[in-house]
A protein has these predicted regions:
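Carbohydrate-associated surface elements
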Residues: 151, 170
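Conserved small/polar residues in nucleotide/adenosyl-binding loops
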Residues: 230-236
């Protein structure tokens, strides 16, 4: 379960991580269903690299639609019937699948979102952090947790979640033929991410601006893009 997949306009590394895990499991003979939101022009159902994608609901509707799909699955109906295990991805808040799936459930979270929730506004931000920091740990008490780094595990421990397993992010294989580029500067940096406030790309811009002769390539897009570009013109 994940709120987006990599074909979503706002999909990113979290979604790619889960897809790669799913593709590996599918290659080992397991049946993998990736339940996610239905974004514009996306099919309700498709199979990609051995993984079956099942979509329904938008930004907020994805959660109740997933609950309905899991409940239907317990009755032997729909895409989620016969499920042996569930991976519930917590992108701020989880699906709380443990309450409705009827199957062993693992909670996957890349990091805590304490610093990100204010972007959602004062009311929604407080509600989101309450669900993430207070409700989810109670619902998932005793369930396996997976995260991607020691820093994230320590953040989980601060919320009372002990013993989270670390499965680090991987890398896709390097292509056999990589073009060779001439060095443009003594210091050449690259950022690769969605352009949203909490990625703090402006920190890299400020650092490079203070380093004579340095070059920075900003790769990515997002709703914060115009603000990031405006930052380039501001005096440092």
């Amino acid at each position: 379960l994940c709120w987006r997949d990599s074909t979503h306009p706002q999909g990113g590394g979290s979604e790619r991580y889960l897809e790669r895990v799913g593709e590996y499991l599918a290659s080992q003979g397991h049946e993998v269903v990736f339940r996610t939101s239905k974004h514009m022009n996306a099919a309700h159902r498709e199979v990609r690299d051995g993984v079956r994608y099942s979509r329904g609901g938008a930004k907020f509707g994805v959660y109740p639609r997933a609950w309905a799909a899991m409940l239907a699955g317990r009755l032997g109906l729909g895409d989620l019937r016969g499920v042996d295990a569930v991976i519930d991805t917590q992108n701020g808040i989880p699906f709380f699948a443990r309450l409705v799936s009827g199957a062993p459930t693992v909670l996957l979270t890349h990091h805590c979102h304490r610093e990100q929730w204010p972007v959602a506004g004062p009311l929604l931000g407080r509600l989101g952090w309450f669900l993430e920091s207070r409700v989810a740990p109670r619902v998932y008490r005793g369930a396996p947790y997976v995260t991607v780094s020691e820093a994230s595990r320590q953040d989980l421990e601060a919320l009372g979640i002990k013993g989270a397993h670390i499965i680090a992010n991987g890398l896709d294989p390097v292509p056999d033929h990589v073009p060779s580029l001439e060095r443009e500067a003594e210091v050449h940096l690259v950022t690769l991410s969605r352009l949203v406030p909490h990625k703090q790309i402006e920190h890299a811009m400020d650092t490079v601006a203070q380093t004579p002769g340095a070059v920075l390539d900003v790769i990515g897009s997002g709703w914060w893009e115009a603000v990031s570009y405006t930052h380039l013109t501001l005096p440092t």
